[in-house]
Amino acid sequence: STESGVPDFRSENGLWNAKTRFNCTPEEIVSHSFFMNRTDDFYEYYMQNLIFPDVKPNATHYALAKLEQMGKLKAIVTQNIDGLHQAAGSKEVYEIHGTISRAHCMECGKEYDLDYTLDKSHWKEGAYTPLCSCGGVLKPDVVLYEEALNDELIMKSVKAISEADTLIIGGTSLVVYPAASFVNS
């Protein structure tokens, strides 16, 4: 996704090495406890650094979608949260770190799409925090630090990898666990 204009996380100039105005690291900001305790600050960072509504899939996204259409690719296992694989036409995508494309109300559970989340008329007054029609805070469907990965997605991912004749690994440093261990499973 970096070729599409989405910044990476772990390089020298990546998001995790950037300074923030919140007196803590970016990794602390995208933690469950920070979200729960400083929701408005979380959303300010999230909206400015993790949401890129204008990015488009690149040639690699389209090539992978084409391979899937041809029956040559069974699944995409990704740590990306940007939804670009689906935007390119891929159907069987396992987003193990979740997606920015959805959010759900922490009060009533209602689900919303990214367009709703980005619509400022739904934001808490004076903040970036999107609210449900019931007034509850929306939580993005991304896996924050201190949260568990979805067991069903992990099982599907490991199964797809273990059954693959050929494995294409791209755009990752393979240092984030447990995803990095999937290739050894």
Predicted regions and their residues:
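Conserved catalytic core of sirtuin-type NAD+-dependent deacylases
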Residues: 1-185
